Amino acid sequence: QLMLNQGTYGGERYLSLETSRLFTQSKSPTCRRGLGFDKPVIGNPKASPCGALAPASVYGHTGFTGTCFWIDPDNQLIYIFLSNRVNPSRANNKLGSLDIRTRIQDAIYKAIDRKSQKDS
C-alpha cells in the first residue's frame, strides 16, 4: 500500500516522491527495471514477467518460489500471488510452463474491463 500511495501510508510519508519514482520507473531503454522493481516488456507480452493486459505503469517482483506481486497505480490495484513452486522439488516448473501467474493477472484485468463496460 505504501508503494501504491507513492511513499505514504496512514497519512505519514515514509519515502519521498522522488525515491518512490526511482524504485518504479525504468531509467534505460535497454533495461525495463526500476531500482528494485520489475516492469513489463513493452511490445513483447510473451517475454514479459506480468500479464499482457497489465498497463505500462505496473511494477512488481517475481520470486524464486513462484510468488509475485504487481502494483498498478493506474487502476489502484495490488495483485499478490503466493505459492511454493519448489514443492516437491526445485525442478517443479509448472507455474512457469503453464503461465499461471500472468494468466491470473490477465483474468483480473478482464474482470475489471467487464465491470467497467457493464457500469457504462
Predicted regions and their residues:
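Catalytic loop of the DD-peptidase/beta-lactamase superfamily, centered on the K-T-G motif
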Residues: 1-120
